[in-house]
């Protein structure tokens, strides 16, 4: 009987130690993931800085402001329009490849980033008209337009 109690005590000690080790490792992983989640944009910003993307703003005649990132030299124009809950910076992961063949303009649609935040402009027709103005007055050349999610609806 004494041998069983000793064995049970040893097993409990091992189980307790294992539990504490797993708890510490789990907390460490949780802290790491929380940090990554709170600093997710830093990777995008480093990529944007490395590429030399220039952030600009243009004020339209109607007073609306379009914020955008521009990258590239003498190449055909490509306009990137993001979807909901995003910004032009979200294209940073594909910009290196796109920059090989395109002069990139990635805009913040209204209500996002540094573009106008007014309820009256959150309509596809207004966005569409203002993007046409942007192409005609800022890009000033034939432009391929690509949109993601809601940005694709705007592009259409």
Protein language model regions, located:
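Alpha/beta-hydrolase fold catalytic core
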Residues: 3-76
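Short beta->alpha connector loops
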Residues: 64, 85-87, 152
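Active-site loop/oxyanion-hole signature of alpha/beta-hydrolase fold enzymes
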Residues: 109-146
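Conserved HGGG/HGGXW glycine-rich cap/lid loop of the alpha/beta-hydrolase fold
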Residues: 71-114
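Gly/Ala-rich beta-loop-alpha elbow adjacent to hydrolase catalytic centers
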Residues: 147-151, 155
